[in-house]
Structures are given as structure tokens and as C-alpha cells.
């Protein structure tokens, strides 16, 4: 028997923070080739976000060390990282996915597979349409997390979305991930897991595994719409401290170097 592909979101236990190695009923599972499995972290932040400090290259290097096939750099209301990387040499066999985390009027919305003009503060429906027009996929980030500008369920109900982030490694309470997973199941949405890394040590803590024949942005977007398997764990207490407090000193000292000559 070969490896398995979970075509329906797995149950993610909140007791130990590990959503991987989850068994599902046999009717949810099919056998596939290992060569088609690709692992992505679709929610990361570089020093082009005000609350993060690592360069795009450092995020990429961390992802490569951890065996990922690609990342989406989704800075807050900024696509500068992708302009920054244009023309720079990237690791072979690794995909950097365009993206941005937009602070809409109703909460945070990820754009995956495309870049956008500045849309901070615009209505979520308007941003959602802009993402679709740009050819990307819209994913509400850390929904239900009221302390981190997650879009609340009563408004989520009105959004024409296909995918939901059901496991965010940095949520302020694990119940928010449980609620997101239940909501995705109820609406029949596809699921993702991501680190929401604001420093390179958190990259790849949580990821999504996809079935893909090609390592390209169009293939990833197609796989997103078909559905992936969230994997990984929550940030440790130490990692959480680094995210919320330790970064500020590093940001103060690193941000002037973000455009090295």
C-alpha cells in the first residue's frame, strides 16, 4: 500500500497542537504517487511587513531547509517582497508564490497567486473581487480570531469563497482553528494550514500538502481549488514570544538593511 491523500479536511486535534498523522474514513482516502505531493506554507511575512524582520531570502532559505516545495510571501498590505525578489536567483525546484494579506474593512484576507494594488481598508467583497479579477485565490486568514482581525462568521457567510485557512499556527486561541474547520466542513470549503510566520524560525511549522504534477503557480491554484491537507503544529510558547515581543528589537535593527546594495 502506498501513501495516502486526504481529500476531505482531517480532524485537527487541539489538545497537542499536531494536526498531522490524522486517520480518516477509507472513503475519504485515495492512493497517489509520492512524486505528486508538494508542501507549501501559504502565509508568511517578510520585513516588508511592519511586524516582521526577516528578508524574503531568509524565509526562502528556512523553507528549503525544512523540505518545503514553496511558500507564499503574504506581507500586510504590501507586495514589495515580490518586486524585491524580481531578478534575484532563487533555489532550483522551489516555488515562490505571489501574495498579500489585505487588511480589509471586515478583517484579514489572503490573496494567493497574484499581487494587488494597495487595498487596505477597502470592503472585503471589493478585495475578493479584485483577487478573482487578478487570477488569484482568496483565503480568509485566521477567521474567527477576534484578536487578530479574523473575519467573523456572520460576514464570512456573505463571501463567495472557495478556500478557508482552518489551521493557523499563531492563533490566540486554538478554539478559533476548531471553529474554522467546522465552518469549512459545513460550507464545503477547501482547507489550508499555514504558519503565519513573522520570523524565519516559524516558517513551515504548519503547511498544506497538495497533489500537483507541476511546480507552477497555475498548478498550485488548481490544487488549492481541489483541496489540500493541512499539516503541522502550533507555535511553541517560545516561538510565540519571539513573534509578539522579540521581533521588535530585531526589526529596529534590521529594517534599514532590507534593501541592500
Protein language model features and the residues they cover:
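Low-acidity, Ser/Thr- and Arg-rich intrinsically disordered low-complexity segments
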Residues: 4-21, 26-28
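Charged catalytic cores and adjacent phosphate/nucleic-acid-binding surfaces used
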Residues: 23-52, 56-61, 80-86, 91-98, ...
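Acidic/glycine-enriched edge-of-secondary-structure segments
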Residues: 43, 132-140
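Divalent metal-dependent hydrolysis catalytic cores, especially in the metallo-beta-lactamase
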Residues: 59-80, 137-139
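Glycine-rich, histidine-containing beta strand-loop boundary motifs that form or position
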Residues: 75, 142, 195
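Ordered, amphipathic secondary-structure segments that act as subunit-interaction surfaces
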Residues: 121-124, 141
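Aromatic-lined carbohydrate-recognition surfaces of secreted/lumenal glycan-active proteins
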Residues: 139-147
Amino acid at each position: 500500500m502506498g501513501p495516502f491523500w486526504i481529500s476531505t479536511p482531517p480532524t485537527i486535534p487541539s489538545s497537542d497542537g499536531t494536526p498531522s498523522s490524522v486517520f480518516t474514513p477509507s472513503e475519504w482516502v485515495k492512493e497517489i504517487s509520492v512524486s505528486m505531493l508538494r508542501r507549501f506554507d501559504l502565509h508568511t511575512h517578510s520585513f516588508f511587513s511592519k511586524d516582521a524582520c526577516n528578508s524574503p531570502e531568509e524565509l526562502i532559505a528556512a523553507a528549503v531547509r525544512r523540505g518545503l516545495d514553496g511558500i507564499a510571501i503574504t506581507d500586510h498590505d504590501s507586495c514589495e517582497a515580490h518586486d524585491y525578489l524580481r531578478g534575484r536567483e532563487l533555489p532550483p525546484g522551489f516555488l515562490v508564490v505571489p501574495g498579500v494579506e489585505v487588511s480589509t474593512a471586515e478583517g484579514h484576507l489572503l490573496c494567493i497567486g497574484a499581487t494587488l494594488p494597495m487595498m487596505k481598508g477597502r470592503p472585503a467583497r471589493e478585495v475578493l473581487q479584485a483577487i478573482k479579477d487578478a487570477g488569484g485565490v482568496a483565503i480568509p486568514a485566521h477567521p474567527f480570531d477576534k484578536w487578530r482581525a479574523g473575519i467573523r462568521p456572520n460576514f464570512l457567510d456573505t463571501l463567495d469563497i472557495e478556500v478557508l485557512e482552518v489551521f493557523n499556527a499563531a492563533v490566540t486561541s486554538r478554539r478559533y482553528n476548531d471553529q474554522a474547520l467546522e465552518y469549512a466542513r459545513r460550507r464545503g470549503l477547501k482547507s489550508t494550514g499555514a504558519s503565519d510566520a513573522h520570523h524565519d524560525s516559524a516558517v513551515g511549522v504548519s503547511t498544506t500538502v497538495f497533489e500537483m504534477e507541476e511546480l507552477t503557480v497555475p498548478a498550485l491554484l488548481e490544487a488549492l481549488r481541489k483541496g489540500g491537507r493541512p499539516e503541522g503544529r502550533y507555535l511553541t510558547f517560545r516561538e510565540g514570544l519571539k513573534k509578539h515581543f522579540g521581533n521588535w528589537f530585531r526589526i529596529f535593527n534590521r529594517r534599514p538593511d532590507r534593501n541592500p546594495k
